[in-house]
Amino acid sequence: MAGTVAHPEGITNPPIDELLEATDSKYSLVIYAAKRARQINAYYSQLGEGLLEYVGPLVETTNAQEKPLSIALREINAGLLTHETVSDSLPPVA
């Protein structure tokens, strides 16, 4: 069966170990990827309306059915995104 080998994308490719190098923990990776996936999803939704508020995928999408989360994970792995860690401390309430 030549030509039927699946090329894994998304959760299995890129490997989780490579993705964890871009963040502090697996929890921040989940939030990081989910926020970017929401931006990509909003970009595709707004295309029909003629609005260009969000930035589209920064990596080439060869499959039209590729999920926004898979695209976000590939962007993180490629080093195309940056994120800032926010301090958890809140100012005292007066």
Curated annotation (Swiss-Prot):
Record keywords: DNA-directed RNA polymerase, Nucleotidyltransferase, Transcription, Transferase
Gene Ontology annotations for the cellular component aspect, listed alphabetically: DNA-directed RNA polymerase complex
GO MF term list: DNA binding; DNA-directed RNA polymerase activity
The protein's enzyme class: transferase
Gene3D superfamilies: 3.90.940.10
GO biological process: one example: DNA-templated transcription
Enzyme Commission code: 2.7.7.6
Record field: catalytic activity: RNA(n) + a ribonucleoside 5'-triphosphate = RNA(n+1) + diphosphate
PANTHER family for the chain: DNA-DIRECTED RNA POLYMERASE SUBUNIT OMEGA
Record text on subunit structure and interactions: The RNAP catalytic core consists of 2 alpha, 1 beta, 1 beta' and 1 omega subunit. When a sigma factor is associated with the core the holoenzyme is formed, which can initiate transcription.
Protein family (similarity comment): Belongs to the RNA polymerase subunit omega family.
Function noted in UniProt: Promotes RNA polymerase assembly. Latches the N- and C-terminal regions of the beta' subunit thereby facilitating its interaction with the beta and alpha subunits.
Protein name per the record: DNA-directed RNA polymerase subunit omega
Species this protein is from: Frankia alni (strain DSM 45986 / CECT 9034 / ACN14a)
